[in-house]
Amino acid sequence: MTRTFIAIAAMLALALPVHAQDDDDNDGFGMAGILSASNKEDLPPITLSAGMPLADAPWTLDSGTYYEFEIEADGSQELALVGPEFFRAIWIDEIVIEGLEIRPLGLDSVEFDEAGTMEIGFLAIKPGSYYMMIPGSTGETQRLEITIE
């Protein structure tokens, strides 16, 4: 009888933490969870133009936050933007080009042969220091430093 009582008490004690879960915390997310509008930020655009800086300042991002930014090319020159390490540290939700939505599995670079705008929506994931740059360029203004914290 004592053994049975001890066994039942032990099973009940092991089951208690399951019922102690704290579900009343408010993380600020809506129905879409981490993709909710309350977790979304817009970044300043990147400008692709011959001899012009890519951006005004480096980006500092928070891991777990959803971001959107535009790449605006003026068509002054055929220009690309590379950042393979950065693109592997984020999850790209969508790329929008003239109303067409693309949902890629990954990305290494983008290139503009003429004037246009591209919007990229992504979730910052892996903390670290990254960059996007115009390939073959050496100037500091042709490179955007990105930190994910």
Regions found by a protein language model. Name each.
Residues 4-14:
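Sec-dependent N-terminal signal peptides
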Residues 21-37, 105-149:
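Extracellular/periplasmic metallocenter environments
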Residues 31-69, 74, 105:
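N-terminal edge beta-strand
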Residues 55-85, 119-125, 131-133:
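Beta-strand cores of secreted/periplasmic/IMS beta-sandwich domains, seen most often
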Residues 80, 86-98:
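Short aromatic-acidic-glycine turn motif
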Residues 94-109:
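Solvent-exposed beta-strand/loop surfaces of large extracellular or lumenal domains
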